Amino acid sequence: DTPKKNRGWKHMNGHYHRSKKGGGEWEFFDLPKQWQIHYKDLTFNLKPFNFKHTGLFPEQATNWDWFSDKIKHADREIRVLNLFAYTGGATLAAAAAGAKVTHVDASKGMVTWAKENAVSSGLKDAPIRWLVDDCVKFVEREIRRGNHYDAIIMDPPSYGRGPKGEIWKIEDSIHSFIKLCTKILSDDPLFFLVNSYTTGLAPAVLTYMLSTELAPWNGTVESQEIGLPVTESGLILPCGASGRWEAK
């Protein structure tokens, strides 16, 4: 284990204990039921869940900064589709940058949480469409409707179920889903972002899939590991990978 020399470890507010059977539970010392954290102009409401999450993946801030800059300098309205959108970090970042956003997640509770984050961030009246839906079925319906988006963000879980029990396994489904999503890209797409927290989807794999499926748009692809810097050691705590396609 990494030596825990920082004095903050002696005053931690909570400790998540993993179970050998899967899952785990929190041990609370001095932790409120809910608290807020700020990133630039965004405010997020956090609370602990039995599956370890607190409602935010802070390592995604590097992606928020990247696509926010692209949206701000696009000189046109950008329609963004955020799939598996969780508590709305990417949704709020895109909306704050001036985009018109469609936020889709299969969990009603997560969409409600994302709306609360929007209110806390001063984005209550931003052009965000909130949808509780199975992401694959939503995209299939958008294809039939003829709707298109200038940018797509997806943060798929390793494993999940839709509102009606639809099963999602990322290794089996992600490539075909990326291909499906290209059918709702506009004629002048700005970017396409895929996040992965599964070890089997390394940056090279994300690069291959994005390069293959978005070849007709003649953009550039960059994939990389993302993580959180550890102040004490100077090391980076690995937190998954991101694949970015962007227009030239």
Model-assigned labels for residue ranges:
Residues D1-L56, D65:
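Non-catalytic substrate-recognition/targeting regions of SAM-dependent transferases
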Residues D75-Y86:
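Conserved class I S-adenosyl-L-methionine
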Residues T87-A99:
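Conserved SAM-binding loop of SAM-dependent methyltransferases across substrates and taxa
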Residues K100-D105:
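Conserved SAM-binding motif I beta-strand of class I
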Residues S107-I153:
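S-adenosyl-L-methionine
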Residues K108-M110, V132-V136, Y149-L180:
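Mobile active-site "lid"/loop adjacent to the S-adenosyl-L-methionine
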Residues L180, L185-F192:
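Short glycine-dipeptide loop
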Residues P189-K248:
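C-terminal catalytic and target-recognition region of SAM-dependent MTase-like enzymes
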